[in-house]
Each structure stands twice: as C-alpha cells, then as structure tokens.
C-alpha cells in the first residue's frame, strides 16, 4: 500500500508539472504569434518605406538630371556671355545701342542664373537631407529587422525545445501511466491474495483459539484432578522452586564478570602506581628528603601512602573471587552472589584508607602553597587539586554505598526492595561516569601543575620524572574508570533485567537461606537428570540435512505447479476412463452380436437342406404375406429393461437374443473393474500413508531447522554485540593512547623549552664569568 501511495504521489507531481509546462507553452505560443504579427506589420512598414525610398530616389534622379541640364545651360550661357563680351569689345565702337541691349540681356541672364544657382543649392540641400534621413531610417529598420529576426529565431528555438520537452514528458508520463496501471493491477491482485490470506489466517486463528481453549480446559481439569498440592500462592514455598537454567545467560554473565575483572585489575594497578608515586613526590617537593628533613605532615602522609597495597590489592582479589563464583552450573542472581559482600567490604576498607589520607593530602597541598617557591599560578593549580581530591573521595563514598546496597540481598534481603535494584545499577553507572569526569579534571590540573613545577629554580630531574610517572598513572586510572563506566552503561539493561529470581510481581528478595536451599535442590535435580540421561541416537549428518533442506525448499516451491498438473491429469484420466468403459461395452455387445449371427447362419444352412422345391412353390404366396408382417414386426423395436439399464433391440423371426446372457457379461465386466479399482485404491492408501509419514518427518525437520535458525540468530546478535563492545573498547584505548601521546609530546616540548632556557642561562653565565675574568685581568 505504501508503494501505491508513493506511485500516486509521483504521478500527481508529474501531472502538476505537465499542467505547468502546458500553461507555459500556451503563453509562449501567444508570444510567438504576437511576435509573428509584429514582424508581419514591420515587413509591411518596410515595404512602404522601400516604396517611399524608391520614390525619393526617382525624385533625386530627376533632380540630378535637371541639375545637370541647368549646369549645361549655365555653361552655355557663360560661353555665350564670354562670346558676347569678346564681340562687345570688338564692336564697342560700332553700336552703343547694341551694348545697352546686351547689358540688359546680361542682367537678365545674371538674375536668371542666380535664381537657378539658388534653386540648385536648395535642391542639393533637400537631396542631402533626404538621403541622410533615408540612410538613417534604413539603418534603424535594418537593426529592428535583425532584432526581430533574432527574437523570432530564439522564440522558434524555445518553441522547438518546449515541444520536444513536452513530447518527451508526455511519453514519459504515458510510460509511467502504463507502468502505474500495471503496478496497480499487480497490487490489486496482491491485495486480493492478501485478503484471501487474511481470511485464511483468521480462520486458522479461530481454529487455534478453539484448540487452545479446549487444551486449556483439559489442562485445568487435569490440574484440578491430578494436582492436589498447589503452592504457587506461598512465597516461602516459591522461594524453594528451582528456576529455569539458562546456560547462555550464565556464560554471558561470566564473560561480563571477566571483563569487569580485567578493568578492575587495570584500575588497581593504576591506583598502586598513583599512591606510590604520590608518596615519592611528598618526599621530594617542596623539600627534598635527601638534602633536608621534610615536614612531619609529609612524613605521616608518606607513611600512610606506603600502606596503599594493603588496601588496594584486596579489591582485585574480591573481584577475582566473584568471577570464580560465577560458573556455568550455578544460578547467579543477587540472592546467590555471596562474594559480592566481600568485594563491598574490600571497597569499604579502601574508602577508609582514602578518608584517612585525604586530610594529609589536603594539608600537603596547602603546605606547598605556603612555600616560598610556589607562584600564584601554582597556588591556583594546587587549590583546584584540593577541590578535586575532595570530590574524588565523595564519589568513591557514593560508589561504596551503592555496591553495599547490591550486596544486601545475599545477606540482609529486607534492606533492599526488588523494585529498587535497577535504580541502584543506574546510580552505579552514573557514579562511575562522575568519577571518570573527576579524574579527567585531576589529570588536566596535575599536568598544568607539573609544567609549572618544572619552572621552579630548585626543580630536579627526579621531580620531573616523578611528575611524569604520576601523570601516566592518573591517565591509566582515567582510562580504566572510563572503560568500566562505558562497560557498565552498555550492559545496564542486562544487569537490571535478570539479576533476581522468585515469583513475578514480588517486592522483596528471597532470603539467603532459601536461595542456598534452592541451589542444593538444583544440584540434586541435575544429578537426577544425569542419572536419567540416556545416550542420544545417531542423528542425521549435517551435509545430508542441508541436502534434505534444499530438496524440501525446492519441493515446496514447485508444489503448487505440481498440484495443478496433478489436477489436470486426474481430469484427463477420468475422461479417458469413461471413454474406455463406453468402448469396452460396445466391444462386448458387438462380440455378442457376432456370435448370434454365426449361430443363425449355421441353423439356417442345416434347416433348409431337406426342403423340396414343391414346398417352396406352394408356400410362396403364404410366405410373401408373412414376410410383410415379419418385416413390420422386425422393424418394430423391442425394449428390454434389467438391473443394469434399458436396451432397445430389433428382433428377427428366427430367434430373439438372450438378454440374460448379455446381463451376465456386463456384470462380469463390472465385477472385474471393481476388483481392479479396489486394488488401485489399496495401493493409493498405502502410498498416502507413506507420504503422510514423510510429511510428518519433513515437518519435524522444518521445526528443528527453525529452532536452529533462531539459535543462530541469537548467536549472531551476541557476536554483533561483542563486536560493538570490542570496537568501543578499541576506540577508548585509542583515545587514551592518543591523549597519552599528546601529553607526552607536550611534556617533551616543555622539556625542550626548559633545556633551551637552561642552556641560554648557562651561556649567559659563561659570558658573564668571562667578562668578569677579563675585568679582573685588566685590573
């Protein structure tokens, strides 16, 4: 159904995009049509402008022609004028009247010439202006035409691309539509199949409910009749019931205890190193015991620190005893974990040790602050360590409180309710994380303190190495506590789910005495079951079982096809059986008819040999009459009925076929068929019994395979959990090593800086000593 919803959503999105593209296509089509109309109007305007341009060109040609004529006329007039002037010079003396006349003509000609020149200039100006206007208009129209042609080409390209895009999208949508239709049809078929399956499952559920109800009634009747003593309501008696043995749970719990033991060993080693190097530091700084006597406070502090192994080592021993008490055969719960009390006592003794050394440690830090060598920054670091040590002791007190609460069910079960022990585990995890954070702060502050102490003028190499050792021990302690905190948080659900036994819903723990009795009863039950245990029969080999499983899977896959083929073949066999019965009856009847015909022939041949010819002639007339009647009687069918059925036959005059013999033959035939069918039925019954036994065996194998599959899945889950846990441990160790390397690199850098400073100081001292020696020599 989710797939159909996704497909419908995709189809709706495609339809929306298609509608958007269609609307855009219509808008673009309108734009293209408008641009085409504009281009057509501009083409018409261009034609009109071309026509006007041609007219102007014609006018200009006519004007140029007229101008040329006028220029020629002016030249002629000038020539005539020059001729007249020459003639006038020659004939000045001849006639003054003619000179006056020529002067008048000359003035007229000059006026006419001046007018023509002015008109020619005006026409030239008009021609130039018209030419410039025509060129400008032509350039504008050409640019507009180019722009319109480019726009039209762009619009045409856009239209082509959109049409291609629309065709592609339409094809895609059609393909998607066909695919969606096919998928919808398949989903409808699947929905029908699912409905049928749900109906079958509901029917099976009803059958199972009815069967379970009947079984419940039977079991209740058996319990009421056969179980006279029922102690399920008494908590005292329930405490003595042996719980179910979960070997996998015991192995996992032992594995977790082993991991916790390794973490505790790491923490114990780090604590021993920390207290030992702290003792060494108290004897070195601020006063070195090798050169001077240290204060009584530090003497007492170092004396107490010297006893740290007496309090720290038992923690490892107590955890080892707890680990050894968790075996595969026992039932490990809080009521039976007696060794947890010993570990709690060892933790209490170590807590007393911490409380004993805490005042001396705080006073020692205060004494360092009061020293003249202590700077302000070093005092600040000492006060931070002062606060951190108080916090560390307080968090250890909280941890001891919760561990002692966990040890109560094995000693005093009334001190803790079953509903509260999960909260105790969560508080232990929180306390471990809090101690990890405090140790991080201690390592940071102590590293800063160590770098500041290296700058003290009286700092020795022994102090530097001691500080490095203390830092490494604090880092290892931080890593160990971080590992056990993450380990506890990762397995908190396992700890809180199944670390108690007893009746469900109970608020109190089982008493230790009852738990001890339960363990004794469990040992007795195990011994009794071992005495009853018989050697198992040889099972199917693993390879053969795998082969049988493959065959079973292949047979289940092809079962439906084979069932259809069997149904079709059964229908064909039934039809063929019917046809066979029909033709066998036809053959029997034909055989009977053949025998009767042969008998008739023999009787007719023996009867007619003794008759004479005269009798034939005499009886000829009567025979003709009888033949007519016999033909009629022969043609009339005779119906015979029996137990088998009805038979219609035509009889002769000579002899009627024996119906009883026919019935006997048919009866014999059916008896033979019945015997054959009974033999086939017996064979089919034996085969069905054999197949039923095989199916039961295969069902048993299938159930065993499912159980093995479940066990393998559980093992796979455990393996994945162990892999994740190992990866977490690897990451934590990697981070711790990286932190250590970074701290060591920082320490080396600081050491190099101090060495360079010391070398520079030595060089300066040497230079000053050389200068002083030279001054002394000069003196």
From Swiss-Prot:
InterPro entries: PPP1R21, PPP1R21_C, PPP1R21_N, PPP1R21_six_helix. It is found in: Early endosome. Keywords: Coiled coil, Endosome, RNA-binding. GO terms for molecular function: RNA binding. It comes from the Eukaryota. Residues 85-105, 612-637, 760-779 are annotated as: Disordered. Residues 96-105 have a biased composition (Low complexity). Its main location: other. Residues 624-637 have a biased composition (Basic and acidic residues). GO terms for cellular component: early endosome. Residues 2-212, 556-614, 693-739 form a coiled coil. Component of the FERRY complex. Component of the FERRY complex (Five-subunit Endosomal Rab5 and RNA/ribosome intermediary). The FERRY complex directly interacts with mRNAs and RAB5A, and functions as a RAB5A effector involved in the localization and the distribution of specific mRNAs most likely by mediating their endosomal transport. The complex recruits mRNAs and ribosomes to early endosomes through direct mRNA-interaction. Putative regulator of protein phosphatase 1 (PP1) activity. May play a role in the endosomal sorting process or in endosome maturation pathway. Coiled-coil domains of PPP1R21 are essential for RNA binding. This is Protein phosphatase 1 regulatory subunit 21. It comes from Gallus gallus (Chicken).
């Amino acid at each position: 159904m989710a797939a159909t919803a996704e497909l419908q959503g995709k189809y709706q999105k495609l339809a929306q995009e298609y509608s958007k593209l269609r609307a855009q296509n219509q808008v673009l089509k309108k734009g293209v049509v408008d641009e085409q109309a504009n281009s057509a109007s501009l083409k018409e305007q261009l034609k009109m402008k071309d026509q006007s341009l041609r007219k102007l060109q014609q006018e200009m040609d006519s004007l140029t022609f007229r101008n040329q004529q006028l220029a020629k006329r002016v030249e002629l007039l000038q020539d005539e004028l020059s001729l007249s002037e020459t003639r006038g010079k020659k004939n000045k003396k001849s006639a003054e009247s003619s000179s006056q006349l020529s002067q008048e003509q000359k003035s007229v000609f000059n006026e006419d010439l001046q007018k023509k020149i002015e008109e020619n200039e005006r026409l030239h100006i008009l021609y130039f202006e018209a030419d410039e206007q025509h060129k400008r208009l032509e350039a504008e129209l050409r640019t507009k035409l180019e722009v319109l042609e480019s726009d039209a080409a762009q619009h045409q390209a856009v239209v082509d691309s959109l049409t291609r895009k629309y065709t592609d999208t339409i094809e895609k949508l059609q393909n998607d539509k066909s695919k969606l239709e096919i998928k919808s049809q398949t989903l409808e078929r699947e929905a029908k199949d699912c409905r049928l399956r749900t109906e079958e499952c509901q029917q099976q559920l009803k059958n199972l409910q009815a069967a379970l109800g009947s079984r419940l009634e039977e079991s209740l009747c058996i319990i009421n009749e056969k179980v006279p003593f029922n102690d399920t309501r008494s908590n005292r008696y329930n405490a003595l019931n042996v719980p179910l043995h979960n070997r996998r749970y015991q192995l996992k719990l032992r594995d977790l205890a082993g991991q916790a033991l390794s973490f505790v060993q790491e923490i114990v080693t780090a604590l021993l190193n920390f207290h030992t190097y702290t003792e060494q530091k108290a004897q070195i700084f601020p006063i070195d015991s090798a050169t001077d006597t240290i204060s009584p406070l530090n003497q007492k502090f170092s004396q107490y620190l010297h006893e740290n192994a007496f309090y720290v080592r038992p923690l490892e021993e107590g955890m080892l005893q707890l680990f050894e008490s968790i075996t595969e055969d026992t039932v490990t719960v809080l009521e039976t974990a007696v060794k947890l009390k010993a570990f709690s006592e060892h933790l209490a003794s170590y807590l007393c040790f911490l409380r004993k050394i805490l005042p001396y440690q705080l006073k020692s830090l205060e004494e360092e602050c009061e020293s003249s060598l202590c700077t302000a920054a070093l005092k600040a670091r000492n006060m931070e360590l002062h606060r951190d040590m108080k916090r560390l002791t307080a968090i250890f007190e909280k941890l001891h409180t919760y561990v002692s609460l966990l040890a109560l069910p094995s000693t005093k079960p009334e001190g803790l309710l079953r509903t509260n022990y999960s909260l105790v585990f969560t508080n232990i995890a929180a306390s471990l994380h809090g101690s990890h954070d405090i140790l991080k702060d201690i390592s940071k502050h102590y590293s800063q303190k160590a770098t500041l102490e290296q700058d003290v003028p009286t700092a020795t190499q022994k102090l530097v190495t001691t500080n490095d050792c203390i830092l490494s021990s604090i880092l290892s302690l931080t890593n160990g506590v971080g590992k056990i905190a993450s380990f506890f948080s990762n397995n908190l659900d396992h700890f809180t789910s199944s670390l108690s036994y007893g009746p469900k819903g109970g608020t109190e723990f089982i008493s230790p005495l009852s738990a001890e009795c339960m363990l004794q009863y469990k040992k007795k039950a195990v011994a009794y079951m071992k005495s009853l245990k018989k050697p198992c029969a040889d099972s199917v080999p693993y390879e053969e079982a795998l082969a049988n499983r493959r065959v079973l899977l292949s047979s289940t896959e092809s079962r439906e096809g084979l069932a259809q083929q069997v149904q079709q073949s059964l229908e064909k066999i039934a039809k063929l059986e019917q046809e066979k019965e029909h033709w066998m009856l036809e053959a029997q009847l034909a055989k009977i008819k053949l025998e009767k015909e042969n008998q008739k022939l023999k009787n007719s041949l023996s009867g007619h040999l003794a008759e004479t010819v005269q009798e034939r002639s005499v009886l000829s007339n009567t025979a003709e009459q009888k033949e007519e009647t016999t033909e009629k009687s022969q043609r009339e069918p005779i119906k015979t009925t029996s137990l088998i059925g009805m038979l219609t036959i035509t009889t002769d005059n000579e002899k009627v076929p024996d119906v009883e013999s026919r019935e006997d033959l048919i009866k014999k035939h059916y008896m033979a068929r019945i015997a054959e069918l009974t033999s086939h039925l017996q064979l089919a019954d034996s085969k069905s019994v054999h197949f039923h036994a095989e199916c039961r065996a295969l069902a048993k194998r299938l159930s065993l395979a499912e159980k093995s599959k479940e066990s393998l899945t559980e093992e796979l889950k455990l393996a994945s959990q162990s892999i994740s846990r190992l990866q977490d441990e690897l990451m934590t160790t990697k981070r711790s090593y990286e932190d250590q390397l970074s701290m060591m690199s920082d320490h080396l850098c600081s050491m190099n800086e101090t060495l360079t400073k010391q070398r520079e100081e030595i060089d300066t001292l040497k230079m000053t000593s050389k200068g002083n020696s030279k001054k002394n020599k000069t003196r």
